[in-house]
Amino acid sequence: MLEEAVRRSGLPYNELAAAVREMAAAEGQSQIATDRSRVGHWINDGGRPQDPIPRYLAAILTKALSLTNPLTPADLGFKEPVLTQLGATPEEAHAYALTATTTDLRPGDIEDLDLVVHQFGALYSTKALGELWGEVDRCRKRAHSLLTHHRHTLREGRELTRLAGMLSVILAWIAHDLGEDELTRAYCDDAWAQGIEAEALDVCAWSEDVRCTHALYAGRPYDALAAATRGLSVAPAGNRVALRLTAQLARLNARLKNRSAFTDVMAQVRTHSDRLPLHRSGLFDLDAAVLASYEASSLIWLGDHREAVVAAEVAIGHYRAMPQPQLAPTRLAIAQLDLALAHTALGIPEQAVSAAREALGGGRIVDSVRRRSEHLEYRLRLRYPELRAVRDFGEELRDQLSRDVLAPPRPA
């Protein structure tokens, strides 16, 4: 007990004396040593249980119990630490450390959100947009609740914020596919803000990828160019979002009839394309099929329709070779519509109508497909107003576009 009492920093000396009295009585010492210097050395050096010094200390303190005044450190040759006199304790430091690691999150809360972000990205095109919105929106609200209504560590907060941003990117894509302009921009804004706070600039870049695509199909190429440039300014070097935004920049220059810039940027993109897989599904992936599709659209805008046919057919071939073609129905439909536009310009409307029917046969008529098909139908009517196949296609298109875009996609 004496050893414990001596080693407890800041223990009041009257308590220490009481402990010594108990120990001295138990050991029944008959000889009393009065060498206080040896006692002081024992205390200051830490002492060991096997040392005999505690017995001398017991004798001294037992004798001192008869004193009127309580014992002081000087009575034992022991100097109390300065910081202890100021009220500093190890317990206070331990409390600070505990505060830094205190969390109300359950094991798996963050990991579960991370998993669903990957799942939503990979299986995006296999779910009805209405169903998908409900699922992603619930997860986004869950992330918000964990951030605002639960205690968490700074590290956990940063990761939750990053995941919240990625969920908002997915919600922005759904809003884009539904043609919801204000909602798309709002979720892009939120994703950018979350990425900045989480110091996850790839989230910011992905938000600008959505904003760029949405503005392009909405007929605002300069807004799309601004978004691509902004995204590239923060995209981490070597990240696939950087290459995707570079490819976006190439087709935007084509859309703006800037042939030389398109050629330069597309050459830069091609230097990386050999390292890409031919086809890969998901919102956050990039493959050679996407680049071929981007090039087909670009060549149509530049008026190079024969080259556009080749690029569109390459993209279509890549998508059809996918183990699960239904995982990229929108990109496949866009490539088929680009092929139809090229055939229209080359004077073969029957092939144009055939390619367009294949594009609309996938059953997932998102806003970008609707806009592209309406443009195609306008070009066909402008050039071949008397052709029966063109009139029939116009009626079919109106029927297709009247269907509920929230309906589940048709099985492949």
Model regions: which residues?
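Extended, low-complexity intrinsically disordered regions enriched in serine/proline/glycine/threonine
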Residues: 11, 98-102
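Conserved binding/catalytic microenvironments
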Residues: 101-105, 110, 114-412
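Domain-level recognition of soluble alpha/beta enzyme cores
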Residues: 72-94
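Recognition helix of helix-turn-helix/homeodomain-like DNA-binding domains
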Residues: 22-49
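A short, Lys/Arg-rich alpha-helix, primarily the initiator
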Residues: 1-26
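DNA major-groove recognition helix of helix-turn-helix/homeodomain DNA-binding modules
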Residues: 46-69
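Short C-terminal boundary/hinge segments that cap the last helix of small helical domains
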Residues: 62-78, 291
